[in-house]
């Protein structure tokens, strides 16, 4: 008796072009939402989910796991639907925003292609702007839980890249100075900082946090940098915003827990969601 081997998920097959999978995902989104193209995309991390309701009219929702290349979210606090939202800008014009509701983390073991599939799908829908958000640990004791911080740069400590082959992308301004200036017009008090991504899923040790600080990091987390790299490769203009949900290990007097991250995100949710919606409408 012979058994049929399980089918290989497209992104796991080295012979598969990940950009073709992203194109298929974009086509599925267009058909499911009735929106031919999107102007911008948002990835809402821990604590940021409420921003979707404040952006504008939800045109359609698509279960994320039904879109080619995506799977259900593995982390509590992350959305499981992808939304197309009609956004009325401050100048009266209308844009369509794609809110990606399922972020894949590197620690899930699905590979780097899966981590950046949402970003490549956003680009395939026509998006020119990408807003990446996350919940993170803070090294600056002046930034208490609930503080939003604009990303000015990042340090990729995953030892991985989403790019394959001789793809040499300039990351000098990976986080758009223009978009950061726009965000400061919405809230001049927003601080800026450098974000360091660790692989996870375990939290950083106090020694690792000290190392990150010596390297120049102000924030530590487990997402965002690989997505930002892929976004720049696709030609997207990127804005990164972190929500400090806790002080990092060795700085915080208490042990870290994911429940703490979710609780801090929920407490800050209304304020940071309104901030993000205001920025997106610009």
Curated annotation (Swiss-Prot):
State the UniProt keywords alphabetically.
Glycosyltransferase, Transferase
Concerning Pfam families, the annotation shows: PNP_UDP_1 (PF01048)
Per the UniProt record, which EC number(s) apply here? 2.4.2.1
Can you provide one Gene Ontology molecular function annotated for this UniProt record? purine-nucleoside phosphorylase activity
Q: Which InterPro entries match?
A: Nucleoside_phosphorylase_d, Nucleoside_phosphorylase_sf, PUNP, Purine_phosphorylase, Purine_phosphorylase-2_CS
Enumerate the catalysed reactions. Answer: a purine 2'-deoxy-D-ribonucleoside + phosphate = a purine nucleobase + 2-deoxy-alpha-D-ribose 1-phosphate
Which GO terms of type biological process are on file?
Answer: nucleoside metabolic process
A GO CC term assigned to this protein in UniProt: cytoplasm
EC class, as a word, reads transferase
The entry's a purine D-ribonucleoside-binding residues are 204, 246
PROSITE patterns registered for this protein in UniProt: PNP_MTAP_2
Q: Which residues bind phosphate?
A: 46, 78, 103-105, 223
The yes or no answer to whether the keyword Lyase is present is: no
Signal sequence annotation:
none
Q: In which pathway does it act?
A: Purine metabolism; purine nucleoside salvage
Keyword Disulfide bond listed: no
Tell me the CDD domains matching this sequence. PNP-EcPNPII_like
Query: What positions does UniProt annotate as the active site of this protein?
Result: 204
Quaternary state and partners of this protein? Homotrimer.
Q: What function does this protein fulfil?
A: The purine nucleoside phosphorylases catalyze the phosphorolytic breakdown of the N-glycosidic bond in the beta-(deoxy)ribonucleoside molecules, with the formation of the corresponding free purine bases and pentose-1-phosphate. Cleaves guanosine, inosine, 2'-deoxyguanosine and 2'-deoxyinosine.
The similarity comment for this entry is: Belongs to the PNP/MTAP phosphorylase family.
Question: Can you name this protein?
Answer: Purine nucleoside phosphorylase
Task: Name its species.
Answer: Cellulomonas sp
